[in-house]
Amino acid sequence: MPSIGPIPTIPDEGSRGSSATAAPRRAMASYRDTTLGGRAEGVAFSAVEDSYTSSVSLARMLYGGDLEEWVRHTRPGVSLEIQSRAPVRFPPPNNPSSRRVTVVRAPMGSGKTTALLKWLGEALDAPDISALVVSCRRSFTRTLAKRFNDAELPGFATYFTSTDYTMAGEPFRRLLVQIESLHRVDDNLLNNYDILVLDEVMSTIGQLYSPTMVHLNKVDALLTRLLKTCPRVIAMDATANAQLVDFLASARGERSVHVIINSFAAPGFSQRDGTLLRTLGTDVLRAALGFVLVDDENGTKVMETDSRPISARLREVNSAGFFGRLMDRLVAGRNVCVFSSTVSFSEIVARFCSQFTDSILVLNSLRPSEDVAFWGGVRVLIYTTVVTVGLSFDTAHFHSMFAYVKPMSHGPDMVSVYQSLGRVRELIHNELLVYVDSSGARAEPIFTPMLLNHVVSRQGGWPAEFSQVTDALCCQFKARCGPAYRTASTRGLALFVRFKYKHFFERCTLASVGDSINILYTLLESNQMRVAIEGCQFPLTAAGFCDFLQDLRLDAYAARKEIKQLRGPGGIAATPTEVFENDDVAVFIQKYLRPGVAHDEILALLVELNSPIVREQFVNVAVLGACLRLPAALESPEVFAGVYKHYASGVVPVISDAGALESVSITPDVNVLARWDLYKSCTRHARDLAWDPSRGGSGLDMSEDFITNTLSADYNRFQSLLVEIAKCNVTPLEMLAAGAVRGVTTALSGRPKSRVPLSKGEHAVSLFKVLWEDVFGAKLAKSTQTFPGGVRVKNLRKDEIVALLESVNVNHSECKTHRELYALLMCNRKLFAGPRYKLRAPKWSRNLCFLELDNTGTCKTPLDAALADLAPSAWPQVYGAVDFDAL
């Protein structure tokens, strides 16, 4: 573990002395009194509020590990039932003493849905009793419908069987609906349901934050109303937490709420042993696929084909790591299932496994789905998060499970990973082997881990300095989340605003591989699984955990280049005729692109737009260009909203991973005012830098001081907006300026020891980089030119040399000729020696209709049409302008 040095004595609050831990202690004190808005905003505070500011217990609290203690201390009027050693049992529905609302927290495989079916069978004892079941996903709705049918629960319809958009009348009095279609249920029905069921309730609420949630305001209002008024409510989840119970107790009264906490887990989970692996083993992968690394003439490692038999190739590699262990089990004739958090890796694993068996089933977004009943017919099952809640394979067919998890800013989050790992209920050898790829974690120093592993803490193994620093970081994160979504745009959203902290936590912690591991560790243990780290003896120590993170980081970065080379080339199956005669493509070209873009460039763009991240950034660049062309958008929130919704709504054509042309719906962010706030500053940046994607990016070089000054006016606001818009939690400069904080956070990031404080300039450059990269896809690159500007030294004109000399206050009055000025400039070249940066535009943005050009006009017409319905009063009034609204 990187040494943090001796832990000094912490001075009393009144002391003027300094210490390595003074900064984190001051930060803790600074953030201690900042809350998420109190109970009025729905954050469940226990009697000991430190759960939100404890780096050890935060994950456990957010996933309901402290629910029993919290109910006893904070909501004593809520009835509490503790169950263990047996599957979930519901109170009889017809018992007069039964409460109106029942919340069930129980692990996967504890019989929650089975108990629900039994309860509904008794509760629906009369044909006039109605019920609404709200699920988180379409696939889960189908699974529930099948189970309801198998249980012979009569009269249930599903929303996808409705022939009309609005579901109304007797056929839908018993209905299963996915939350995103809740607005399609007729109000008369919604006001009269007798029973509301939310299976996987936390995932259902989490769906409110999905970019596919088109009717957020209406769905939020309807679900809130149902939770407050429906006569009987059943809410179940393995991670049901205090926030949920607190909301229901506030809405219905404590005496109406009954909480069941069941700790039983089926043997398929409770006897499962999980191991976090240190290495991926790309040497085994490379050998199996028939490649070998050789040195080229420059000494660089390159991959070449190895034509030897596979047995000869594999004899030369060490069968360790993820692929080595997978190979051993396949060679031994065992059946394995493999979870991959990315589609591309699932395809690589399929190619690897095909060297040992032909009996392989791959379930991802590129391939057709397959009924769970057929899983038992293959030796190897490979799946992604397309297989999630609702699907269960209960047969003891697979011997072992492997999991590849790559935390990335766009997900999947660790709860989704955990849910996918639970789809195979029985493993013959009860073996789960997990490799967490850290190459997708954020490398910028302004992103820091904030969680400590609870197992190390259980053994008393974390130094006090680690706890103080990470607790302060948790306080900072809590304070950062508090003001989010408090604008007129989000007014009226009850559940969306109330559960925001958990959403931010799950997204922001994806920046850190250590945080992601600690969350997954917590979730697996909550399901009664035993988890260990390869190479770490019991008890797990702080040094052992940090060494593991360092090994993991080094292995992942070494493997990343090889994985990229081994990835199969993609192709475009759609023909040019099919693409360019498509109506959605025609509308897209007119709406977003400048005239005359070549067909091959458009095809390349559609391939890039298959990425959800690129789609978001593409829209953001389009909006930025519109704000530069239409300054009124920066003066009026109504005009900006019109511009933003024009570009962020509708459909975008993409070329999928399979090469097919598809149309993807896009939905504007609900928090338009926060985006307006951000764009006002970013438009100023773009104007000052002469940033134009069609010309490759910025027209000027930037020094560290220039970037610092550019951000200074809105520095803190940028950090807050990045949480709301990009789901990035930037650690503030005042914390990273402390050597102790730097020492702890580098150790928890698996990086070499560094107690060197981050300077103001370094923090500003990193913040600027993240802002433009995450929101607009731009890259901040160091300039290699001797002098600022885009002109080579030998091509500098006289006036350009004068401008350079004056920029560093060099007197040039004695120099009259170009030769003299040039000589003076070269004599003072050291004044330009500091690092300078260029802001490069992403390649996919270069054909966007960005700035007003002589031949532009196509993208202006649809934008003008979109803004035509704005009231005259929405447009800013300038001096001398006529106020048409007043005429």
Swiss-Prot record:
Q: What is this protein called?
A: Replication origin-binding protein
Q: Which GO terms describe its cellular component?
A: host cell nucleus
| TM helices/strands, residue ranges | none
Native source species: Equine herpesvirus 1 (strain Ab4p)
Task: Please name the SUPFAM superfamilies in this protein's record.
Answer: P-loop containing nucleoside triphosphate hydrolases (SSF52540)
Can you tell which superkingdom this protein's organism belongs to?
A: Viruses
Return the similarity comment.
Belongs to the herpesviridae OriBP family.
Q: Name one Pfam family in it.
A: Herpes_ori_bp
Report the record's disulfide bonds: none
